[in-house]
């Protein structure tokens, strides 16, 4: 096994037994690939911007004299990089420039003669860019566009399952859903007539559509029915016989031919009878005349002589009509074949309810239904129907839609056609009728073959197209206005509607969400989320049970575990670990191909549609050495049903055991032992874990922690291999390996780290290096850990020593008892960064001013501000402190006589400004870690702003200079090697100044060329440095583009350190959550015979009823892992020789190992020392989902660590020293601190704002509201008879306006009496009664 440099430092022991055929794919590819498709120039014009432009352009004027053509587009360079956009609060985007060509035709010359062509590049707004981590920065905040799961375009056959009509009759329907355009529905009513609806409007008989397509009644019947031919021979009526049609009928007369009776009258026709008839080749039988009565004619019969209609198509035949026919000389007669079993008379019945007779009347009928109240004209009706389904501008099935449509109706041609045609409509009606006749199945809407994913790129393209269509109308009008001789393309195009559409989508669409940035896992999960809500999707209220439920096609595509609890359950899903989107937007999952009974390593991706036809074995099927199945019968799935199949029938096999579940669920060890409901909570709660001060890797993991940490983008990952040249807290420099160099570059990679930045959830983002100078790294190695990562592995919480036992009721009902040591060691201390901003605006009365000179504020309150009135960095502030002093001009006020007197005596003008400073919110206390000042262009910068500017310039220069020196050093090293090769000696080189090296000349021509090349590069490097610095300087010194009316913005960042305390919520990874009830002194905690106390005591009663046994296994394995770490620590302390250490490590890694095969002998002595050093805190183990460590391995591990195999220890009470009466399960569990902190939730109201109508206090912490004293609480006080308390609650403490003002006055005066009055809600009641027209007045006593 080859380990990367960081992996070697701490190898995670793997208990997995299945071979890893496929690595987990890049986790963010669903976002990045989709957006890449949108942005990249697609020569075919299938996707993205190119497709949008081609679908709207060329735009022709109404009179056809000119047109605007699209040539190409290009995206410019973004003005600011991602970090600058976040600081300045702007959108990270590129300008879109489109090359357009205006062609003017000559009116007088023949059509198509060009008079003039003008080409120009036109600016069409900004396109937001995706960052490399799959997010967008919109107005300075990171957002994610969630992918949407919507109904695929195509045709769907469905039934109402007997719910619509009271009789319980099943009504079938078909619906054609285009990608854009009108829906077309066909449906049966309870009388079995077929109707059509357009866009869910009023229904019309379905034959109307066929009439519009130019079909007559006879042609319609011809399409939908088989015919029966009758012939009159020698005064007898003969019927053409197709024996199969008689199946299941009861004979109403003897069926005979050539004197042989096949079926007697009144008998049922059976299969035997039919075989007999077929064998004897009977084609015609004689039928009584009455038999034809009531049958339906298939076409019109006209009396040739008189020209009158004897019988029309679709008319029932009577004896009279029969006589007329034979009189007119008709010997043959065609009637429709119908029966009650499988050839219903539906279309024939429908034609009878259809009032229209020809194409025009049908068109008019459709026009009336679509545009009620408008007078129909032939032209309007024609064009309306044409534009509904047959015009490419208004209607598009899309490639997916056409593919689904064709596969549904079995059509081979029309691959590219986006509109409908006659064949499509007729085939859909035919299939619907055959389903009604009992042939064929209805579709399953929740099948993932009928639902597709719409990702970022596609949604952005649709929005962009909407903007373009808006522009198109304006362009058409401007083109038609006449004088085009001096008009350029940019005069025609207004970019506003385009950028507005795009901005609206990214800024306020339901699927553009504020990124969940609690920890790396929550970021990754948010980007892999699939929502059924949103525009064009479902709504919470309308979504029923079926849509939300787990479907068999979710297997390996959508996770059955991870979904929110609450109203969105099942509507928001997560992508499974290996799933991906195919070109049509359907989800695919990988399987290993089975060839001739042998499982190969070839992997095929199958969509839900393709999967149906195969037999697929599970990932844990037993295999032989050769790769065949060990068992005769293999558990496998076919069409979603699990069962035992002979091994010869198996076509595919799962690639991995965690293929079924999402990333979050794959991070839960022993998931297979947890109940599904608890696993759901576990998966969801990991996303709420707050990054702790020092991240600690989980002792018991699942082996995919590294994937999540690296793919999430919070770590710094080596782009190329090399050697670490220098490391400090904010930068890592790597000297790149020779073989990975691009010819002619300096060969230095510089990684700038993110320090103490605020995340969207106010947690702290900070990267710290985990490599040392001189260490070799390869491409993809982790160089620096981000939040919640430890040596490149995801680390959401801490490993805590846990005991399962009750402790004095402090762990009743999921409470958690925590040792004080956990607080002292800062195990769960987290840093939260808050951003507070102060905006100075230009008001009507004058500009607001940021200053330290604030009226009526004491010296003490201003002690932390500098002369500009802004708090200094490092100040420790608490609730109510001033951060930024600001004054606002206030209008002239009427002076009181006293003030006039004072004015007259002292002659000073009373201040005409009021204090509107930014103060720290009441519940916050912390340290100021950063201040940023943004000043509008043209407004003079204050001293503090200039200081910050100088500091930034200095830092930028230092960064760039260092970067330049590093690159220069790399370049000169290459020059030196060229000169040495060219005959210079070391001594000679050291005598020449380094800068002069480039001016030397060499005899060897090749080396001289190299030297000249390097000299050129050096000049480029210098020029590049100057250019970069100038750009940086311009960005720092230029004014900021602030919102209208804003002069200055000051942003202050506070860091708040939160220790763990009672009331905080904690959880394990198995859905075992609880609230801390008490923090207990270490000396009172239970301890084992070595005197080691436990950190946390959990209630054992939380396990059995919840059935999450995974946590118990985790605790046992954690104890063993820690025990092995202790043994290694002991060996290091005793300074035992390396050979013994190697032997022990090998023994540990070999235990229960089938696939990892760690070979300690391959590691150098230094590597072994590093490894042993990193394992002292415990041996990290991986137990993959559904392939975890068996009980035997856990016991063996415990024995190896010299611990009891039961995993239970004798504990002693810390308070008395007595042993507890039975052994207790003790071990290590990975605990998380969730982002539900008691500090953010505790709140108490003194006095505050009141609701306008009811005059009652508001509710909620944000409004500084009170606690609601509701109906039930009133009953409680009534039951106690606490009359005075009750009166106080309902009056002065709530909505008695006068009473509460008096109360306030009384308290100030030291008089604690209350005078209750009339509650405002009583007045509201009076008003409501009056609004009903009943006058009600209060009488005074």
From Swiss-Prot:
Keyword Nucleotidyltransferase part of the UniProt annotation: yes
Catalytic activity: RNA(n) + a ribonucleoside 5'-triphosphate = RNA(n+1) + diphosphate
Stored SUPFAM superfamilies: beta and beta-prime subunits of DNA dependent RNA-polymerase
Disulfide bonds: none
Keywords, sorted A to Z: DNA-directed RNA polymerase, Nucleotidyltransferase, Transcription, Transferase
GO CC terms, sorted: DNA-directed RNA polymerase complex
Gene Ontology BP term (one): DNA-templated transcription
Superkingdom assignment: Bacteria
Enzyme Commission number, as recorded: 2.7.7.6
Pfam families: RNA_pol_Rpb2_1, RNA_pol_Rpb2_2, RNA_pol_Rpb2_3, RNA_pol_Rpb2_45, RNA_pol_Rpb2_6, RNA_pol_Rpb2_7
GO terms, molecular function: DNA binding; DNA-directed RNA polymerase activity; ribonucleoside binding
Function statement: DNA-dependent RNA polymerase catalyzes the transcription of DNA into RNA using the four ribonucleoside triphosphates as substrates.
Family membership noted in the UniProt record: Belongs to the RNA polymerase beta chain family.
Subunit-level organization: The RNAP catalytic core consists of 2 alpha, 1 beta, 1 beta' and 1 omega subunit. When a sigma factor is associated with the core the holoenzyme is formed, which can initiate transcription.
HAMAP family: RNApol_bact_RpoB
The protein's name: DNA-directed RNA polymerase subunit beta
Gene: rpoB
